[in-house]
Amino acid sequence: MFRCVLTAASLVLFACGTTVHAQKQTVGAPPEASNMKLVGTNDLQARSAYQPTIHHQGNRWIAYIGHHGGTDDVPAPVNPMTGKAEPNGTSIVDVTDPAHPKYLRHLPGQDGKYESGGAQMVRVCDGKSLPKGDPNAVYMLRTFGSEAHEIWNVTDPASPVLIARIGGLKDTHKSWWECDTGIAFLVSGAPDWRTRRMTQVYDLSDPAHPQKIRDFGLPGQEPGATGAVPTELHGPISTGPEGNRVFFGYGTNKGGILQIVDRDKLLNGPKEPTPENLRYPEIARMPMSAFNGAHTTFPMLDMPVAEFAEDKDGRTRDIVMIVDEAILNECGEARQMVWFADVTTETRPMMI
């Protein structure tokens, strides 16, 4: 089994290996590994990597890698394939032979540095999975810096074609795309909303013709609201029509909120962003400490608990793993950690 790990500016490919016992770390000592070994690398043209998606296309494995914006020292690295300086965007790498990854294409992103540019997020769906997609096509959804979402036809990953763009935004981030339905929960910054990031729900079942369903966020974030603005969205995770839940995480490193939403009510309920309509699909909301965020809210549902195996009730639990993100280096903020919430009684989630 192969696993992919992205460092600040490289693609690192590992394979399972024999166990190596960790020793005391010493400057200049050889590298250590446990249950894996280094197979291959690619420097990604020295572009800082954020999110990878590894997709099986035909008889190949293709890595689609989102990048942060450039740095003060190198705002736009040179692309050796074109000979031109290009703002960081999306790297496309053939990793079928992990010992020899082949860089196929760089798609430039928004000009800018760090969080202000690049194309950080990428999702990929097969056309044969999407209800109205071309069954012979493969589609990539990505952010374009802070200003847009883009959909590309990547059937030939070396020659992507832009087919749709959702622009006019003030921010974007880590979206979620259901490949079986085409429903996309896009982390956006609608210009008239009071928060930097909220959710725009789109039907991307026909990727070339996006259809907007609604805007969504926490009451107090909507246009025309007054008072304090609730914590901005970081990202959602949907369980699809079968699970009928969307788990939203608000806050990156402070003021975190876990929100559990009825997916069907979100898609089919009243759309006007009034406080009542925004509350309508919500099942529960769990505020966290002001010191910690809810960067990722990952559902792990119907989990057996070995210690409870003989209990009459509660032998399995619905758990949400909540991951914070540290933003400031050298202890410049509160300690960011991983938390686990029991949402078995979903109207009363509790941290465990």
Summary of predicted features, one role per range:
Residues M1-F2:
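N-terminal secretory signal peptides that target proteins for export/translocation
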Residues V5-G17:
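Bacterial N-terminal signal peptides
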Residues V20-I352:
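Feature marking well-ordered beta-strand scaffolds used for ligand recognition
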